[in-house]
């Protein structure tokens, strides 16, 4: 029974892995990806509410002035 010659397996496996790595890198680098989303500037409108022009103070039940 002849013995299997495994002396070339190492270089074959390494060269196959290097070739696959290069092919995948070329395939990935040729694809175009969408740009990352940029934040949208929102202009807030100032509304005139009647309670904004007045100053009101809310008293809690325990903080009422003494009578």
Curated annotation (Swiss-Prot):
Name this protein carries in UniProt? ATP synthase F(0) complex subunit 8
Superkingdom in the source lineage: Eukaryota
| Family in the record | Belongs to the ATPase protein 8 family.
Complexes and interactors: Component of the ATP synthase complex composed at least of ATP5F1A/subunit alpha, ATP5F1B/subunit beta, ATP5MC1/subunit c (homooctomer), MT-ATP6/subunit a, MT-ATP8/subunit 8, ATP5ME/subunit e, ATP5MF/subunit f, ATP5MG/subunit g, ATP5MK/subunit k, ATP5MJ/subunit j, ATP5F1C/subunit gamma, ATP5F1D/subunit delta, ATP5F1E/subunit epsilon, ATP5PF/subunit F6, ATP5PB/subunit b, ATP5PD/subunit d, ATP5PO/subunit OSCP.
Which residues span the membrane?
Answer: 8-24
- Bilayer disposition of the protein: Single-pass membrane protein
User: Which residues get modified to N6-succinyllysine?
Assistant: 54
User: What is this protein for, i.e. what is its function?
Assistant: Subunit 8, of the mitochondrial membrane ATP synthase complex (F(1)F(0) ATP synthase or Complex V) that produces ATP from ADP in the presence of a proton gradient across the membrane which is generated by electron transport complexes of the respiratory chain. ATP synthase complex consist of a soluble F(1) head domain - the catalytic core - and a membrane F(1) domain - the membrane proton channel. These two domains are linked by a central stalk rotating inside the F(1) region and a stationary peripheral stalk.
Keyword set includes Transmembrane: yes
An example of a Gene Ontology cellular component annotation for this protein is: proton-transporting ATP synthase complex
Q: Which UniProt keywords apply?
A: Acetylation, ATP synthesis, CF(0), Hydrogen ion transport, Ion transport, Membrane, Mitochondrion, Transmembrane, Transmembrane helix, Transport
Specify one Pfam family.
ATP-synt_8
Instruction: Kindly list the biological process annotations in GO that this record carries.
Output: proton motive force-driven mitochondrial ATP synthesis; response to hyperoxia
Q: Output one GO MF annotation.
A: proton transmembrane transporter activity
Q: Which residues form a coiled coil?
A: none
**What InterPro entries does UniProt report for this protein, alphabetically?**
ATP8_mammal, ATP8_metazoa
Q: Which organism is it from?
A: Rattus norvegicus (Rat)
**Which residues in this protein are found as N6-acetyllysine?**
54, 57
Where found?
Mitochondrion membrane
